[in-house]
């Protein structure tokens, strides 16, 4: 068993429970442990038939950000691979064999992700080009999934080589809920690792786009963008991609 899963619930206990039931129904042999973080108070999970999978529940006294929660979960990780997952994913098949095949079969592969689909069967644009103001506008007008050569992968499902995650010290906790995925992909690649979206596997994401409805979420999103665009890793990563002819 090779993988530790990290799932963070922001009061999404019932949604997360459906995903946990999907995972336990499939009983993926590669999954050793699930670390479930309740970021805000919620009802206890019911008794679950975990089989070979160990469940660890963390309850935060005060809410933490995306990166902080997953970094805390990683401190419990004793497996060679660490998977960050949103609680609103659904699984029809086990995605991990194909992901591990790419992750273990490619030298210096630090991160992989599956293709992500909406419940209606639409491919989501979760494999993206460098996060610039121009690219952000382009994606809003004409969403495209750059699965062949992505510069970053969206954070709803990220399977890391634990050595890579540890080497770059995980997520930057200076962000809060947004842009942590963009930042960690940039730093991972600058550290000499690579990333990929694996076309042979997929999961469904039943997204709740709160940032489109809440001023508070919008403020966090804009703050994350400004933080990223003013940091050295953004400029270094952009320069590297330009030299490689990918910009």
Predicted regions: what is each one?
Residues 6, 186-247:
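Active-site-adjacent helix/loop segment of glycosyltransferases
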Residues 1-22:
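N-proximal low-complexity "stem/linker" segments adjacent to membrane-targeting elements
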Residues 22-31:
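Short, acidic, metal-binding catalytic loop of nucleotide-sugar glycosyltransferases
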Residues 82:
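Short aromatic/hydrophobic "clamp" motif used to bind/position activated sugar donors
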Residues 152-202:
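A short, conserved alpha-helix in the catalytic core of glycosyltransferases
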Residues 60-77:
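Glycine-rich, basic loop-to-helix element that forms the pyrophosphate-binding segment
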Residues 130-151, 155:
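Short, flexible, basic/aromatic active-site loop/helix in glycosyltransferases
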Residues 93-124:
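Conserved donor NDP-sugar-binding/catalytic core segment of glycosyltransferases
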């Amino acid at each position: 068993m090779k993988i530790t899963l990290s799932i963070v619930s922001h009061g999404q206990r019932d949604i997360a429970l459906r995903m946990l039931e999907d995972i336990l129904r499939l009983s993926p042999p590669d999954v050793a442990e699930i670390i479930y973080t309740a970021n805000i108070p919620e009802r206890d999970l019911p008794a679950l038939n975990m089989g070979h999978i160990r469940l660890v529940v963390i309850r935060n006294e005060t809410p933490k950000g995306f990166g902080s929660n997953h970094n805390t979960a990683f401190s419990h990780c004793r497996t060679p691979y660490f998977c960050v997952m949103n609680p609103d994913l659904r699984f029809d098949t086990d995605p991990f064999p194909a992901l591990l095949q790419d992750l273990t079969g490619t030298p210096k592969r630090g991160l992989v992700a599956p293709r992500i689909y909406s419940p209606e069967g639409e491919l989501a644009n979760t494999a993206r080009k460098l996060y610039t103001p121009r690219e952000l506008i382009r994606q809003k007008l004409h969403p495209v999934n750059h699965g062949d050569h992505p510069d970053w992968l969206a954070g709803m499902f990220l399977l890391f080589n634990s050595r890579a995650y540890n080497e770059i010290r995980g997520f930057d906790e200076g962000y809060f809920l947004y842009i942590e995925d963009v930042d960690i992909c940039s730093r991972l690649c600058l550290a000499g690792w690579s990333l990929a979206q694996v076309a042979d596997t997929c999961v469904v994401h039943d997204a709740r786009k709160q940032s489109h409805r809440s001023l508070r979420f919008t403020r966090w999103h804009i703050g994350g963008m400004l933080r990223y665009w003013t940091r050295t890793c953004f400029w270094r990563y952009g320069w590297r991609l330009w030299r490689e002819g990918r910009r």
